[in-house]
Curated annotation (Swiss-Prot):
PANTHER family: O-ACYLTRANSFERASE (WSD1-LIKE) FAMILY PROTEIN, WAX ESTER SYNTHASE_DIACYLGLYCEROL ACYLTRANSFERASE 4-RELATED. This is Putative diacyglycerol O-acyltransferase Rv3480c. It comes from Mycobacterium tuberculosis (strain ATCC 25618 / H37Rv). Upon expression in E.coli has a weak triacylglycerol synthase function, making triacylglycerol (TG) from diolein and long-chain fatty acyl-CoA. Also functions weakly as a wax synthase, as it incorporates palmityl alcohol into wax esters in the presence of palmitoyl-CoA. GO terms for molecular function: diacylglycerol O-acyltransferase activity; long-chain-alcohol O-fatty-acyltransferase activity; O-acyltransferase activity. Induction: Constitutively expressed at a low level, it is not further induced by hypoxia or nitric oxide exposure. The active site is at H143. Belongs to the long-chain O-acyltransferase family. GO terms for biological process: biological process involved in interaction with host; glycerol metabolic process; glycerolipid biosynthetic process; response to hypoxia; response to nitric oxide; triglyceride biosynthetic process. It catalyses: an acyl-CoA + a 1,2-diacyl-sn-glycerol = a triacyl-sn-glycerol + CoA; di-(9Z)-octadecenoylglycerol + (9Z)-octadecenoyl-CoA = 1,2,3-tri-(9Z-octadecenoyl)-glycerol + CoA; hexadecan-1-ol + hexadecanoyl-CoA = hexadecanyl hexadecanoate + CoA. Pathway: Glycerolipid metabolism; triacylglycerol biosynthesis. Keywords: Acyltransferase, Glycerol metabolism, Lipid biosynthesis, Lipid metabolism, Transferase. One of its GO terms (cellular component) is plasma membrane. InterPro entries: Acyl_transf_WS/DGAT, O-acyltransferase_WSD1-like, O-acyltransferase_WSD1_C, O-acyltransferase_WSD1_N.
Length: 497
């Protein structure tokens, strides 16, 4: 292993600086598995033993050079000469037979604890005791060590499409993969996706994207000031979003339209995690019926779930909640088929009782936002995203001070949709049932929802502050009820099953 220190980059330092006792900057994934038929009863023990006997390679063997002083100007990654794999690889059990809700309880507790930054900042937990002899793997890692793209590549290389393959190394035996230009050119197909398109990317979008945009809005705007056309497009787009309310622009969501909400408060260190999984074909069929994308349908059922969840808490605002979405769009000046990563705001329709009308409201707002972005060149898109998010700095300051401003907020929560593997994957013959992203929350963002597609399903990972949003599992259940309501209202054969 190399003994050369590697300096942290600006984005990595941002996540490190954001670390606190209540805003932990680790992200993760929860993956339940079904063992193959005839698997030995000690299968999980064998996996754990194999893991602990494995060689660990960089970056998994790296720790901070100055863990006691995170703001050190020469903070670097160095090899941990006292690396203890027993500390990083752990085994625990549910009271058998455990269900998905019971699995969410230990994952919530594990995600509530900060990583020890005196050690390489990652852990993997093998959890047994799920009904039917199933088990789960929960992984968490600090976002300053592994970005989402790299983490996904390593996890994917630990799995196989062949159920009989037992040769794939575990993720911490895999060195950092390279990144080709083609990997960043994922087509959105009209949908909303997280920047790089991977299992863990987008988990830190609310911090990296918004924090970076807010802090750098001046420089970004300055970079296009000399380009007359870009400046004109930017000014026009901001006027359309912030000031115009006529028919053509009434569905555009501006940066001061989000209501004050319980989601936008200070948070504690305690977390609650919940999951849901739906067939993609079901969401696709509903979307086709109403000329909506899969992502629109997903947002609509999240809005329906939040409407009931907040109403039961007595915290449902009269106006609709506003969501921030990372998107990929094709700029008008790009003739090569490339995409630009941007940010839009959209309604969740939480003020609408009818599920079909709610979906229509969501679809209208996302369609208007993406159409506006497509009318701009790449420079204007980046500057527009920065300007749209700039008022979030005031929202965050308001949350931290406890003083509500007289004007609306910028947004209430972040939702990311991350395209994942299309094929069923296996770990030593055990079939991966789902891959749930476990994101992060922050002050003024007590809830984050990250979606990931996998083998014909859409997996929802809900992470929230336990003290702000008690009984978060109910929100996950209510999204399912909202989906059923949409299917029933549709009336098309097969959509209600």
């Amino acid at each position: 292993m190399s003994q050369t220190a590697r300096r942290l980059g600006p984005q990595d330092m941002f996540f490190l600086y954001s670390e606190s006792s209540t805003t932990m900057m680790h992200v993760g994934a929860l993956m339940p598995f079904t063992p193959p038929s005839g698997a030995p009863p000690d299968l999980l023990r064998q996996l754990v033993d194999e893991s602990k006997a494995s060689e660990v390679v960089e970056p998994w063997s790296l720790r901070l050079s100055h863990p006691e002083l995170l703001y050190h100007p020469t903070q670097s990654w160095v090899v941990d000469d006292n690396f203890d794999l027993d500390y990083h690889v752990r085994r625990s059990a549910l009271a058998s037979p455990g269900d998905e809700r019971e699995l969410g309880i230990p994952v919530s507790r594990l995600h509530s604890h900060a990583l020890d930054l005196r050690r390489p900042p990652w852990e993997v937990h093998f959890i047994e005791g799920l009904e039917g002899g199933r088990f789960a793997i929960y992984i968490k890692m600090h976002h300053s060590l592994i970005d989402g793209y790299t983490g996904q590549k390593m996890l994917a290389r630990s799995l196989s499409t062949d159920p009989h393959d037992t040769t794939h190394p575990l993720f911490f035996n895999i060195p950092t993969p390279g990144r080709s230009p083609a990997d960043t050119q994922d087509s959105v197909g009209g949908g909303l996706i997280a920047g790089a398109g991977n299992v863990l990317d987008g988990l830190g979008d609310v911090v990296r994207g918004l924090g970076g945009l807010v802090s750098g809005v001046g420089s970004v705007l300055g970079s296009v000031a000399g380009a007359g056309r870009s400046t004109f497009e930017l000014t026009k787009a901001l006027v359309n979003a912030q000031l115009r309310s006529d028919h053509e622009y009434r569905n555009l969501v501006g940066s001061v339209q989000a209501p004050h909400c319980i989601l936008n408060t200070r948070i504690s260190r305690n977390r609650r995690f919940a999951t849901q999984q739906y067939p993609l074909d079901r969401l696709k069929a509903i979307g086709a019926q109403y000329d909506a994308t899969i992502n629109d349908v997903a947002l609509a059922i999240i809005g329906g779930g939040l409407r009931r969840f907040l109403d039961e808490l007595g915290e449902l605002p009269n106006k609709s909640l506003i969501v921030v979405l990372p998107v990929n769009v094709r700029p008008k000046d790009d003739e090569g088929g490339g995409n630009a990563v941007a940010t839009i705001l959209a309604t969740l329709g939480t003020d609408v009782a009818d599920p079909v009308q709610r979906l229509a409201a969501v679809t209208a707002s996302t369609r208007a936002a993406k159409a506006q972005l497509r009318s701009m060149d790449k420079d204007a898109i980046l500057a527009y995203s920065a300007a749209l998010m700039a008022p979030y700095g005031v929202q965050l300051a308001s949350t931290l001070s406890g003083v509500k401003p007289p004007w609306p907020y910028t947004f209430n929560l972040c939702v990311s949709n991350v395209p994942g593997p299309e094929d069923v994957l296996y770990l030593r013959g055990s079939r991966m049932e789902a891959s749930y992203p476990v994101s992060l929350v922050a002050h003024s963002q007590a809830l984050n929802v990250t979606l990931q597609s996998y083998a014909g399903t859409l997996n929802f990972g809900f992470i929230g502050c336990r003290d702000t949003l008690p009984h978060l599992q109910r929100l996950a259940v209510y999204t399912g009820e909202a989906l059923d309501q949409l299917a029933a209202a549709d009336g098309a054969a097969g959509l209600g099953s």
